[in-house]
Amino acid sequence: MSPAIKCLILLAVIALFFVTEIIPLAITAIGGAVACGLLGLIPAKQVFSGLSNSTVVLFAGMFVVGAAMFYTGLAQAIGEKVVHIFGTGENSLMLGLMLVGTALSSVLSNTGTCACLMPVALGICAASKNPASRQLLPMAYACGWGGIITLVGTPPNIIGSGALTAAGLPGFSFFEFAWIGIPLSVAGILYMLLIGKYLLPKAELDADQEIEQEIEATTHDKKKQMISGMILLVCVIVMALDFKFISLEMTAIIGALVCVLTGCLTEKQAYSSIDWVTIFLFAGMMPVSTAMDKTGAGKLIANWAVGLMGGEPTPLIVTIVLFSISCFLTQFMSNTASAALLCPIGIAIAKQLNADPKAVVMAIAV
């Protein structure tokens, strides 16, 4: 059996485990990397090369910087302030929650932002006699599409950039996703205000029910809130300016170190704020991606996919097809796992057609 066929079989097994989650995603990814080494698809010394990838460092650093905003209570304070500015009318409250959700989730954890804003939304809704069920769903949507705006907004964006870098191509800049993220966010907000609100449930929620937050604020010290906000702002500015003497991952780690040194969060909180599943999933899939490239499995998939699309599909058709596949897969599996699985395949297809891999990868990540 040729190495390419072995790699394809392994990829199919990984995809099956990703969809069914019979075993944890991180275990599947790391197991896939180990299998690549055992099958001789890549040299043994490359099996854990993903753990030293600079993208892993970027992930870890930004998880900590973002968590500092939650632990100091700054994220919740911003949410409360914005909601009070917009008022308690149904439409104005919905707009305020969506705007703050979009803005915060563009640089912070989507889930963390949503969990942080939920008590704010419930409290305001209870005081203003607004049905909370009509505010929570638009807010959750906003936290989802807000993550598309920047490179660090959501793990699939960073995974896509890492896949490009691993393939020897330039990765995405910090605000490159904004070309899609901002118009999509504006369209989403307008849709919810003009059409979506009529489709929302009208059931009342118990305002006193306990909401389990991803990260509880451990302090409301104004000084620490200001420090955590300044750290995030400086990180975003430095990443956006893309200085040659300091990389994205260096910026993220420096920001994380300053967060701990200034007491915005403890060392233990910093460790717990890192999404280790995302870290190991990405680190495990990088060697699998390398194996696909070296064995020719990626090219086989690309040739097969191109053949299914008529032999000479336009880059637009390829992008639409991969976007649709990604949307379909994320209904059954983690969006992070979906991106890790599809990005290397998308790059292989783009190379086969001499198309821009960035456009294809961006469509998959979005």
Predicted regions located by residue number:
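Hydrophobic transmembrane alpha-helices of multi-pass small-molecule transporters
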Residues: 1-60, 64-66, 176-303, 319
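Juxtamembrane and boundary regions of transmembrane helices in multi-pass small-molecule transporters
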Residues: 6, 65, 127-142, 146-214, ...
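Hydrophobic alpha-helical membrane segments of integral membrane proteins
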Residues: 27-32, 110-117, 137, 149-153, ...
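Active-site-proximal structural scaffolding
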Residues: 114, 138, 175-176, 188, ...
